[in-house]
Amino acid sequence: MVPWLGPDDPFPSIERALGPATGAPGLLAASADLLPSRLIDAYLRGIFPWYSDGQPVLWWSPDPRMILVPAEFKVSPSLRKTLKRVLRAPEWEVRVDHDFAGVMRACAQAPRRGQRGTWITAEIIDAYTSLYRSGNAHSIETWHDGRRVGGLYGVSFGRMFFGESMYADVTDASKIALAALIAHLREQRLEMIDCQQNTSHLASLGGREIARKAFVAHVRSAVAEPPIPWQFDKRVLAALTSPAETAAPTGTER
C-alpha cells in the first residue's frame, strides 16, 4: 500500500518504495500538495515527483537509478561536428536561465514517443519556477538567430544536478544544450547527474544505472557541498570537440 502524505507528513523510508514485481516499481508515496518545501525535501532525499493531470502527486525513488557521470559523456562524430559549427557561427548561442518557464512549457508541449499528454503540468511548472527563483533550478537553452530552439532544465543543490526534461525545435538543439551543461559540470568537477529513468537515448550518451543505495549516499554528500556557479556560454563546448569523445547513435529523449 502506497502511503498518503498529509501536508505535515514526512516521506517514508525509500526502502518502502514499490519493488520490481509491482506495476509501479519505485513508487514511494502520494500526496495532494506540491509545495516548494516538499519538493526541496524530496530532492535532498533522492526522491522526485512524476504524475499526470488528474492524478495525485506521485513520489518516486526507483532502484536502480539512472545517472550520467559528466566525465563519461559520449559525443558522436555528428554531434562533435555540430558543436564545432555552433562555436564558429555567431548566430548560435547557449544561454543559461534566460527563459526558464519558457523552457518548461516547451518541454511540456514536446511530443514523446509512447506517451500521451504530459507530466509537466501547470502545477509542476509553478513549483519548479519557485525553485528557479530561489536559485535551485536552472535552464540551459540553445538559441539560433535570436530564437530559443531547444533546451533543458533541472534542479541543483550543492554539487548535484538532477536532470528533468529537454526539448528541441530543430535538430540537435537539445543535444547542444546538454553538451554545454556537461562541459560546464566537467569544469566544476561535478561527479553525477541524476537522470531518474533508463532510456536508450541516455544510455547512448554514457548514462548507466547504479543501485539506489549508492545513489542516495552520493546525493547526501553532494548536496551538502557549496553550490557551483551557473554562468557560462557556448565557449564551454570547445572542450567536447576532441575526437577522443565517441558515442553510439542516439534514441529517444525524456
Curated annotation (Swiss-Prot):
It is found in: Cytoplasm. It is an enzyme of class 2 (transferase). Keywords: Acyltransferase, Cytoplasm, Transferase. GO terms for molecular function: leucyl-tRNA--protein transferase activity. GO terms for biological process: protein catabolic process. It comes from the Bacteria. InterPro entries: Acyl_CoA_acyltransferase, Leu/Phe-tRNA_Trfase, Leu/Phe-tRNA_Trfase_C, Leu/Phe-tRNA_Trfase_N. It catalyses: N-terminal L-lysyl-[protein] + L-leucyl-tRNA(Leu) = N-terminal L-leucyl-L-lysyl-[protein] + tRNA(Leu) + H(+); N-terminal L-arginyl-[protein] + L-leucyl-tRNA(Leu) = N-terminal L-leucyl-L-arginyl-[protein] + tRNA(Leu) + H(+); L-phenylalanyl-tRNA(Phe) + an N-terminal L-alpha-aminoacyl-[protein] = an N-terminal L-phenylalanyl-L-alpha-aminoacyl-[protein] + tRNA(Phe). GO terms for cellular component: cytoplasm. The keyword Transferase applies. Gene3D superfamilies: Leucyl/phenylalanyl-tRNA-protein transferase, C-terminal domain (3.40.630.70), Leucyl/phenylalanyl-tRNA-protein transferase, N-terminal domain (3.30.70.3550). Its main location: cytoplasm. SUPFAM superfamilies: Acyl-CoA N-acyltransferases (Nat) (SSF55729). The keyword Disulfide bond does not apply. Its EC number is 2.3.2.6. Functions in the N-end rule pathway of protein degradation where it conjugates Leu, Phe and, less efficiently, Met from aminoacyl-tRNAs to the N-termini of proteins containing an N-terminal arginine or lysine. Belongs to the L/F-transferase family. This is Leucyl/phenylalanyl-tRNA--protein transferase. It comes from Burkholderia cenocepacia (strain HI2424). The gene is aat.
